[in-house]
Amino acid sequence: MSGGGQLRLSGGRRLLSPGGRTARPTTSRVREAVMNILAPHLQDCRWLDLCSGSGVMGCEALQRGARCVLAVDQDPQCIRVSRSNLSAVAASRSPAPEIRTERRELISWLRKGWSQEPFDIVYFDPPYDQGLYEPCLIALAKGNWLHQDSLVVCEHRS
């Protein structure tokens, strides 16, 4: 992945980063804090990673026992990096978790709804100034993406 750097998972594993201006990776401090808060919910969870960038949050979830990660981003470089990172982490798990990446325009994709098993945790880290929070949260709520006990975590500018 030209132009990309490397990230590290909390366990030390190195991951690829898309680099450039296509993604803003979640800092290791924020990742650790979020994962510590979500720890009781991660084992066997279904994780939806919206605006996934490098896929590092999905990788953290996999490393902590998620059984399924779906990473969604509209940038092709981010999807390539995310797919590579998720595959590397999933390969170390047995039984192998389900991983999937989707290159999609987020709002229209979410508005189509979801016909499969809902997600337990949604992690949403959009570009801060693109007005995605409200329409995406509404689409998540209306589109069978969530169940009664689902958690939605939104990263935003401090």
Please give the residue ranges for each predicted region:
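Class I S-adenosyl-L-methionine-dependent methyltransferase catalytic core
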Residues: M1-S158
